[in-house]
Each structure stands twice: as C-alpha cells, then as structure tokens.
C-alpha cells in the first residue's frame, strides 16, 4: 500500500498541471483502489466477505454517471465501486439539507468558518424535499415500483458543499444537474442542518510549501 501511495502521489502532482478533471479522477481512483485493497485484506483475514462503511462528500460518493460531470469525463468513488462490486453489493447513501449552517472555508488553505447555508434553489432536489414539510427523513430509492424513485429520476439541480462554501456564487460554485435515483441508492434529508465543531481545538498549521512546489517543474 505504501508503494501504491507513492506511485499515485507522484502521478497526482503531475496531473495537477493538466487540469481539474485529470487530478480529480486520479484521486478518486486511488481512493477506490485503496478500498479494494482493504476489502481484499479484511476478507482474506476473516475468511468471509468484509462489510465496509466509507464516509465521503456526496460529490465523491454519488455515481458520477448520473450527473453532468460525466460529460466532462469525470468519475468518482461511487461509480468505481458500483463497477467493481456491482449494484447489489454497494449502497450509496447521500445527504441533503435545505438550509441551516455549515462549517466550511472561503478558499483552500483558509480557516474554517460557520457559514449560513442559503435556502435550496427553487425546483432543486433540496427544494423538493423541503416541500414535504418533514424535518428529516430517510428515502429508499431501490424499492421496486417506487413512485418516489421514478419521480426523482428526473434531472434536477443538486447542491454540493465541501471544504469550501461560497454562498454569493452558489449556483455557479455548488450546483449541478443530477438524476438522483440513478446517483444514489438512498437519501437522508435534514431540512435544517447545524455546523459541526471539532472535539478538540488544535493549533494552526505551520507554513507549508504549496502542493505544486517547486513551481518551476
């Protein structure tokens, strides 16, 4: 695994100069490869199929083929795990919220802040879930003949908030079109979310060279 990490890290830094899609794909491929190696190790040690839970942002977890990023040639962990193990063995569960607060930064390498999340855009998946009037719910999208699953297969805007959140440019920065029922196997919706906080306050990170240092290479 250490050798695989060194090899993929070296290739990752090369692809950073080629564009976002190349570096994104390599990073998610590495995460999927690591998951496959972990599964093989745990299965071999226990003598039976392993069960693994992975916690990721929706943009890494929801099957990229069901979103507009697939048109740019982008894939992710959710797609790769379905392709490797098959849909019967994988459960992709997404999270969504309509409004509230979130812990995020205004830019990479900037300190975290508690930010107010804008209400979901009209006709987005977040807005549709808000219109139910429920404060929270779990929605199984794999039920045969489910009317909800069929209705949510229609392409709609979906919000993705990660390390960075930019409320002023939210439509351009955080929304993309998706087909929810093809993207996820289930959804957990929390209508009003609350920002997470660290269990322990750590010190500020020291000065580090940029990822692409030395920039002349």
Please place each PLM-identified region on the residue numbering.
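Short beta-strand segments
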Residues: 55-56, 94
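A charged, amphipathic alpha-helical module
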Residues: 1-51, 58
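Generic recognition of stable, solvent-exposed alpha-helical segments in well-folded globular domains
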Residues: 7, 26-34, 56, 72-76, ...
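Structural motif
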Residues: 53-55, 188
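Loop/turn elements at helix/coil->beta-strand transitions in domains of secreted/extracellular proteins
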Residues: 48-52, 87-90
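C-terminal regions of proteins
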Residues: 62-217
């Amino acid at each position: 695994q250490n050798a695989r990490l060194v090899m993929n890290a070296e290739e990752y830094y090369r692809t950073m100069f080629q564009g976002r899609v190349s570096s994104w794909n390599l990073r998610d491929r590495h995460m999927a490869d690591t998951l496959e190696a972990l599964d093989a190790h745990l299965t071999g040690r226990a003598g039976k199929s392993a069960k693994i839970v992975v916690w990721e942002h929706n943009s890494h977890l929801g099957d990229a083929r069901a979103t507009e990023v697939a048109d740019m040639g982008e894939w992710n962990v959710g797609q790769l795990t379905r392709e490797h193990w098959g849909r019967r063995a994988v459960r992709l569960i997404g999270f969504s919220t309509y409004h509230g607060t979130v812990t995020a930064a205004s830019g990479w390498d900037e300190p975290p802040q508690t930010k107010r999340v804008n209400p979901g855009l009209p006709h987005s998946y977040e807005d549709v879930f808000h219109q139910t009037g429920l404060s929270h719910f779990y929605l199984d999208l794999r039920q045969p003949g489910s009317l909800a699953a069929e209705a949510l297969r229609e392409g709609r805007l979906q919000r993705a908030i990660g390390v960075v959140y930019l409320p002023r440019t939210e439509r351009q920065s955080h929304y993309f079109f998706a087909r929810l029922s093809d993207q996820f196997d289930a959804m957990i919706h929390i209508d009003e979310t609350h920002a997470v906080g660290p269990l322990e306050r750590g010190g500020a990170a020291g000065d580090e060279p940029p990822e692409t240092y030395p920039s002349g290479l």
